Amino acid sequence: MTAGWKLKSGEILSRQVSNDKLWSVFNYVFSGSKKRNTYKFGLIKALLDNLFNMTLQGEDYFISYQMIFEKFAQNYWNLVVKYHLKQMRSDGRSEYSKVESIFRNMVNANRIIATLEFDVIGETERNRMVQEISKECRKNVVGALYQDTEGLLYSFDLKKGGLYISSAAYEFMLKYKEQLEKLNYYSWAKFLEQINDGNVLIGLLDKLELSTPQRTNLSVYREILKKEFEENTCFYCGSKLTKAIHVDHFIPWSYVKDDKMWNFVLSCSRCNEKKNNKIPAEKFLLKIEKRNKKAAQIHNDLVYEDFKEYDDSRMKRLWKYAQLSGMKQFDICVDQCNEKAGVSHGKISESKIKTSLPHENFS
């Protein structure tokens, strides 16, 4: 049998596969498969981070190599450049993996970028880095993970544009996304413990979880929501927004691991703080779905880019799987928001909420 890392292409061998079987092949990757570097963990994380960027084509879900290895590069950037975590067992010829060597060469050529977050590296430099990593890393890891998962996860052709994830595997990864992420982090950390010195291992799991940094400046989304939709009330409680306007991830960032327009709403500080890492109550789904239908029609480059892979069923499915992963529901805190605004108990609630929620939710 040809070694997995030598494979140039592979077909999905079965589309009728049980969850038990998929757990079996993932657990094999996490524990039993042979590894000289961490690329399999990196590829699994990049796929999980890209679940909501995949598009249904026929009976499978497509994701481009460009999108996969942009996440792959971003995830490795902090681990290698910021935290100095080695990612490969020494093979007698080199102690650095290709992704480490690419980063080291770029940092040696321009020391300044070592201090930068991945997203703020110059676009030309960042694209060149992603292209080089995609070229060097995919020829080894894509076939290797394909073989370890027995051809049940995806089909691929290294000469073409990306992977095709089977529908069964896609639904499985959505349903068990959080559990798969935790197992992947744990297995990745166990591997890193074997090849790194003690000092860099401090807070290792936190370093892995934070390898995909959350974007902190969401002001551009705030302005689009205010300008294009004239949103001047809290999405959840309907109270008038003041200067302290929060851009909230409708489905928490900790689950989605991405910043996209279709998942943003404006909220008051009280609701944003109360909601925290919860999903909104189910009654809010219709409201955001209606908003997103309007948003998809806006002539704005950022909005267009964010909605390219969006479909009408996305929010319902995301909400469902986030709930299955254990996320609690948040409901409106009308009374608390009114009290904070100095409004007497119950005066604002009915009128504001009726305008902020779908009419059919009221008797």
Predicted regions span which residues?
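Long C-terminal interaction/binding lobes of large macromolecular proteins
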Residues: 233, 363
